[in-house]
Structures are given as C-alpha cells and as structure tokens.
Amino acid sequence: MATIKDIAQRAGVSVSTASRALNDNPRISQATRLKVKQVASELNYQPNYNAQNLTRGESNMVGLVFPVTTVTAPANPFHIDLMRGISSALKPLQYEMVVAIAPNPTELLASVKSMVTQSKVHNFLIFYTMANDPVTAYLRKHQLNFVVIGHPTAQQPDRFVDNDNVKAGQAATERLITRHGVQRPVFLDSGANWTYEEARRDGYRQCMTLHQLPAITWSASRDGDIRQFLDRHPEIDGIVCADDILYGQLNRHLQYYDLPIACFNNSRLMGMLLDESERVDLQPRELGQAGVELLFNSRKHHQLVDFKIYD
C-alpha cells in the first residue's frame, strides 16, 4: 500500500508538502497540488482518515442520536432504513456509526456527553426535532457539528435534511379523495407533538380546505379509544395515518371498519399490513445519505428529499 512518503518521492517534494497538497492547503501552489494528487491517484493512495482525525482531536465516528425511547417501544423501521443510508454514505469516508439511545432525556444527554468527552465524537446526526431539546442545546453550546433529520423548530434554525411533510400530507389526502372517492377522511396522530406529525396534519387540513371539506382529527393522547371515536363519527369514510408505528398499534381496531387508508412510511411492516393502501415512501435511505453529505458540507444549510406514493 502506497504511503505519503512514496507520493512525496515520486512527486519530487517533501513529505510535509505532499501532505499539505493532498489536504488542499492554500499555501501550496495549485500546480503542486494537482501534481501530488495525480501521483496519489496513480499509486492508488488511500489516506488514513483515522490518523487525520486523531491529529485534529476527534474520532472517525458519527454519533446517531435517537429520540427518547422506552424499553417496550417497538423498533422503528424508518430509523433502521435511515441507518442503512447513513452507513452506505459513511463507508467511503472511513467513518463508523455510534448510537445513543436512552429511556429519558437525562440519560440521553449523558450518553451524548460521554461520546464527546471520552470517545472524541464531534459529528452527530439527530433523529428527531423538538423544542427545548437538551441534546442539541449542548451541541450548539460546544460548537459541535450536527445535522437534524426533520424540520427544526422555529426557535433554532439548525442544519437539517427532511421531506416536505406539509406537501406529503396534502398529497396523501388528495389521493384518498380523488382515487377512492373519500369525502370525510380522518387524520390520526400520536399527539406527541412531533414536528413531522404536525406538518403532515397541516397538509391534510390544507387539502381539506381546498376541497371545501371538514377536517376531522384524532390524537392518541387526547381522544381515547379509536373504535369509540369512529363509532361516534359514522361519516368518516377514510383514514390518513401519521406514520406506520401508529398504524401498527391501531391496526387490529381499524381492520374492523375496512376504510381506505393512506399511511406514511413505505416500510415492510406497511407492506404486510396494508396490501391495498396508499403508502407514502419518505425514502429514509436517501434521507440518511443526504444527512451525511450535509454533515460534511458546512457551506450548505439544508436539503429536502422527495417522497413517493405507492398503492
């Protein structure tokens, strides 16, 4: 395997000059940089990213921070696909993933602090957005590099990758109305005030207003038993569900009503539960890849990834 010394010798420069040229040091002339890079390419030189990072005082790891998750909570297929995309994007950069998962905000923050102080992790992807979040507040305070998956809150304009969830909410509702003849769809959400749920609900409301139809919403934390709610509202003839985890929890109750359904996340879980539904594919692998690209491109503030709808 070629070394920096081999490159320097063939290019006719010192080892320090070769190193600076490969790192685009502006003190090295453009001609020398091009020459050294050409030699490196000819020798199939593979830089030691880990050594470079240690020199800068950081590890070659990216911290993935999950939302607070209870021990009994089901695994989220969306997060798994996000990680697949992140892993594929990190591989050519010779970075690895390290994960922070905790049952409460205090333990989650402690885990992130440990990553920073003990493992020298300086780059993070945050799998959620929420107001007054202690983790992102800590990362901001210490000027660490991070990107959130999802739209940041108005109070903190953090760098982010996301789908246009308002547009996705509109599109899902429109499909039920135009393809299935639905006139009274209900929007179901967890009531946990997640930004993505609120945005999809806003899109649903906008579509209903456009069609001059009444908006009907149900929240798990507010409205109680879903079957009792549907029995009280016999006019409901369709369902827009905020995500696949929520639908999985409600599936055995909703099957009884046999209503057309539009659900977010085109996961394998949805493929098994909803054979004839409108599934909004938020392309989590592409979101994960975009998150890595943005993490290492400080000149860019955000990136939107398109969604697709399958039936």
Map each language-model feature to its residues.
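Amphipathic helical "hinge" segments at domain boundaries
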Residues: 46-108
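An alpha-beta-alpha
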Residues: 172-213, 301-311
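Short beta-strand elements in bilobed, periplasmic/extracellular small-molecule ligand-binding domains
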Residues: 91-102, 156, 186-187, 201, ...
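Structural motif
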Residues: 97-118, 170, 216-233, 248
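Flexible loop/turn connectors
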Residues: 227, 231-311
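Hydrophobic alpha-helical segments within soluble ligand-binding/sensing domains
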Residues: 161-187, 222-227, 281-300
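Flexible loop/hinge segments that line or gate small-molecule binding clefts
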Residues: 127-167, 245, 265-277
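N-terminal helix-turn-helix DNA-binding module of bacterial transcription factors
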Residues: 1-60
